Amino acid sequence: IRCFITPRVSSQACPDGHVCYTKTWCDNFCGINGKRVDLGCAATCPTVKPGVDIKCCSTDNCNPFPTRKRP
């Protein structure tokens, strides 16, 4: 499987059986910059803390950098 990986947001090969993930959360600058984003791959879908959103998927390049809605 190929997943997008931060910080360069480049597509990279991940080991067999891994899943891609997109993790987003707010920090002190969320109102200005939008949510922080972490893209990667892991053996299983990571467990996250409250306030952190995660989406996992298992097809090539299924975790592109999310687009920010403009007001």
From Swiss-Prot:
The keyword Disulfide bond applies. It is found in: Secreted. Pfam families: Toxin_cobra-type (PF21947). Disulfide bonds join 3-20, 14-41, 26-30, 45-56, 57-62. It comes from the Eukaryota. Binds with high affinity to muscular (alpha-1/CHRNA1) and neuronal (alpha-7/CHRNA7) nicotinic acetylcholine receptor (nAChR) and hinders acetylcholine binding to the receptor, thereby impairing neuromuscular and neuronal transmission. Belongs to the three-finger toxin family. Long-chain subfamily. Type II alpha-neurotoxin sub-subfamily. This is Long neurotoxin 1. The keyword Secreted applies. GO terms for cellular component: extracellular region. InterPro entries: Snake_3FTx, Snake_toxin-like_sf, Snake_toxin_con_site, Toxin_cobra-type. It comes from Naja annulata annulata. Expressed by the venom gland. Keywords: Acetylcholine receptor inhibiting toxin, Disulfide bond, Ion channel impairing toxin, Neurotoxin, Postsynaptic neurotoxin, Secreted, Toxin. Transmembrane segments: none annotated. PROSITE patterns: SNAKE_TOXIN (PS00272). GO terms for molecular function: acetylcholine receptor inhibitor activity; ion channel regulator activity; toxin activity.
